[in-house]
Every structure is written in C-alpha cells, then in structure tokens.
Amino acid sequence: EGHRLEFKDKKNIKSELEIKGVVFNEMKGAMSSITSQLWHGMSRHLYSSSTYKHNSGGDPEEILDITHNDLVNFHKKHYHPSNATFFTFGKIDPTEIQEFIKTNVLSCFEPSSEKLGVQNEDRLSSPKIKSDFYNPLPGDEDNHHVVISWLLNESHNPVELLETYLMSNILLDNSASPLRKALESSSLGKSPSPLTGLEADQKELVFAAGLEGVSANKHQEVENLIVDCLKKLISEGIPKELVDSSLHQLEIRQREITGSGMPFGLQIMLTCLPACIHNDDPLNILDLDNAFNIIKERLEQDNYIESLIEKNLINNNHKLNYSLIPDTNFNKKNDDRIYEKIRNKTKNLTEDDKNKIIDLAQALETRQEAIDDPEALPKVTKEDIP
C-alpha cells in the first residue's frame, strides 16, 4: 500500500487530512538516515542521466503523485517474465524446473518483445560540485558531509572488477592504507565518510572518499586532501609489499566460502546477476583463476596500480564533489511542502468525496483488524513429501 488520505479524526470530515501508507511512511523513515540522504543525493548528481539517479524505494514526496494505474502499468512493463532471469543451483535437473516455470508462470503471460536495459551514464566533460541540505542531530549543527566520488568502469567485467577492488583495498583497506590514513589523520573532519569505498552493485562502479564533521566551505580542501594523497602515491610509488598483501587478502576474500548470512548457492547467483541483467556472460565473473592470473601478469609491469589510480581517479572527469549542509529547519520545510501538496490535492473535494475517504478508512481498519482464518493455510502431510 503506497499512500492514502485519512482524516486525523477518522469520523470527522472537518478534521485535518493526513497522508498515511506503509510505503510512504517506510520511505520517510528510511530517508531520515543521514547516510541514505548522502547516498541518494550523491547518486542523483553522479548518475544524472540514467536510472540510478532515482531512489529505488521511492522519494516520499514523489510517492504522493503516483496513482494505482501508474503502479500497475510500471509493474506490467518492468516485472514481466520476459524481463526476468531464472537461476537454478544444485544437483538437480534444470529441465524439470524449467518445465515447472513454463507451465506455472510463463504460460500465464503473453511474450513481450520490449527489451529493457540499463544504459551507461553519459560521461561528464568536467567535474561537478553539488550540495544539498539535511537535518542535523542535536550537537551536529555545524557538521557538513563532503564526499568526492568518481564513476568508473562496468562492474561485470571480472578483470576490471578485481583490479578496481585491488586499487580500493590498497587505498582504503585499513588505518595504515594511505588514503584512509590521510582521511583519519586530517583535521578537516571528524572521521571518514560512511560512503568511503567502492560500490560495485550497480552497472558502473563508483569509488568514493570523504569526511564527515567538516566545517562550512571546506569542500574544496577535502577534495585537495584526497587528490594530493593520490598524486603523491603516483609520483612516489606504492610499496610492493602493500600491493602483494592487498592482492593476497583479495584472493582470500574472493575464494572463501563464508556463507555471509546466506546459502552459498544464493551467493553464486547474486554474483552472476549483474552480468545476466546487463547481457554479459555470467560464467566469466566466476572465472577467478583466469582473472587473477591476468592481474598478476599486469602487476609485473612497472607502476601498474599507480596507472590505475591515474586513469580511474586523477584523469577521470566524471567526478563529483558533493556536500550535505546542515539545516535545522530542513525537516520542517519538507513537511511544509508535503502539507501544501496535500492541501492542493484536496482543496476541491466535495462532501461526498470526504465521506468516501471516511468509508474507505473504516473498511481498511476492519480488514486490518480481522482475524485470519487458519484454514486458509496450506497443509503438508507425510504423503506430500517425496
């Protein structure tokens, strides 16, 4: 349930109208997180032309404009089986599963010829500087958040993915890593930004580094701190032992079967998923031996990691300097905009319209409070188990 109108006094059409709804309230809660605001704000500017500029859960203010028809049509288009990827894992006959899916799912739909895909972001010709506002916690009224981010190569090329992970690990893996050390020891901020690191879950990789607890108008100094650290590494070189230890740790992490809170088969499926949805070979991403062998060969070249830093970061114009600026009235301004939107949407409601809102609210409450019939639950007997 996305959103609905409801009177503050559910039986009084003279009382104030409010917005209710599971999705609306969930996303208001989710977007109250400063880290979420930082990530979605950064993404909106870094991915200004592609699908990743949108908040996948829904911007609370925009949720108010969606209609039931909008939702149904979007679902029919984007969640059609023709746009799905089906995985099987384990010592089972895939033909049997595929026949089951065909009979019970695919046969219920007409094939769709529309091919949906995520386009690569249009690349910037020059870096951007952008800022937004957030509501600070008590005591943090002067804390600015500054993040410098770069859009890199595609995430489903196994060699490029691993070498970018290696670059990131060398720079940020622990407090002795050069870029993390520079951030943690800087007086410009209190601590590294929670967005610091490599984001590999989208079609194109994002590398970010920054600080929280920064003073006003220090965003350029934060960028200079990061860029100067990177340039120093390029000019002075990265110690071989740091590269070797980072590569060793990366190999262990990539090969280790940890469970990670989920079955190993599901881990494999999720690893393959980006290549599947972006029309690449999913088995390539699992070929770790070949990818690591290529990287080890490249590491025999002089300044291999330094050249990666130079290409991916120093000479990369798709760079964003993004700040979140504290504003103690930010939440109130948001609430005022939502209130004004509600007022504009409801100012022409008739008395019949208002009574219908009361009737619908009562019907929903009755349904929500109804006791579920346990007979509706399926029963499994011993005879059902093969």
Region annotations inferred by a language model:
Residues 2-12, 27, 59-60, 85-93:
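Conserved short loop/turn motifs at secondary-structure junctions
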Residues 13-17, 21, 27-83, 103, ...:
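Non-catalytic beta-strand/loop surface segments
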Residues 74, 85, 93-113, 236, ...:
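Extended, regular secondary-structure scaffolds
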Residues 84-91, 208-212, 320-323:
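Short cationic amphipathic helices and targeting signals
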Residues 90-95, 215-217:
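Helix N-cap motif at beta-to-alpha junctions
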Residues 287, 294-341:
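Extended, domain-scale alpha-helical bundle/helix-rich regions
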